[in-house]
A protein has these predicted regions:
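Glycine-rich flavin
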Residues: 1-76
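Short beta-strand micro-motifs in enzyme catalytic cores
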Residues: 61, 79, 115-119
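Active-site glycine-rich loop that binds ribose-phosphate moieties when present
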Residues: 45-48, 97-108, 113
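Glycine-rich beta->alpha junctions and the first turn(s) of the following alpha-helix
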Residues: 109-196
């Protein structure tokens, strides 16, 4: 992630996002995890809810709502929509990207390439097998699944920030050492002080 971020922070950001979200497979029923990850190119994105109306029924769930800041959504195949049910339990809905509307509201100066659009659905029927409790009912025993999700996000995003800082310092040093003046001499080797 550090090396990728040194070339393109937006790409690294999206990779980190999908990698962390993929660890949710450890909380899914096996059939849902298989449905998503049998495709080796599966990419997941999510975002915090702006609004939602989720009606859980016996065999399926009727979903309407809008979620934002979904980094990498143009490349994603599955969207993780977070909601709180009537019992105040946080749950995740796995929605195929083909069912949502993308809304390009990502007007920023930095990390524009993450394409962190919002997405919305209106009265979409989702099978109940696509819904699972958020961070409950861990089904895998590997140590990575015991690390809190927010810590995984934080360590990835801080790696990106450190890589950007390192790349910026290296660029400034290289620029200072190797910039050439009007007469093709390195400015660092000239005897007079120049200011631009």
């Amino acid at each position: 992630l550090f090396e990728i971020a040194s070339k393109d922070a937006s790409v690294a950001w999206c990779i980190n996002q999908s990698n962390v979200l993929s660890t949710n497979a450890a909380f899914m029923e096996k059939d849902l995890a298989k449905k998503i990850f049998d495709d080796p190119s599966a990419i997941i994105t999510n975002g915090p809810p702006l609004e939602y109306d989720v009606k859980e029924r016996e065999s399926d769930t009727l979903v309407s709502g809008k979620w934002s800041f979904s980094s990498g959504i143009k490349h994603a195949s599955w969207l993780l929509a977070i909601f709180t049910d009537e019992n105040k339990q946080n749950k995740n809905i796995m929605i195929p990207k083909s069912l949502v509307q993308l809304n390009d509201v990502w007007d920023v100066s930095g990390l524009r390439g993450t394409g962190s659009y919002s997405f919305s659905v209106k009265n979409k029927v989702i099978p109940n097998e696509n819904i699972f409790f958020d961070r409950l009912n861990l089904k895998e025993s590997g140590p990575i699944y015991k690390i809190p999700r927010d810590l995984k996000f934080g360590s990835g995003f801080s790696t990106i920030a450190l890589s950007l800082a390192n790349s910026s310092i290296n660029y400034a040093l290289d620029f200072a050492k190797n910039k050439k003046g009007v007469f093709s001499e390195k400015l660092s080797e000239e005897q007079i002080f120049l200011r631009e």
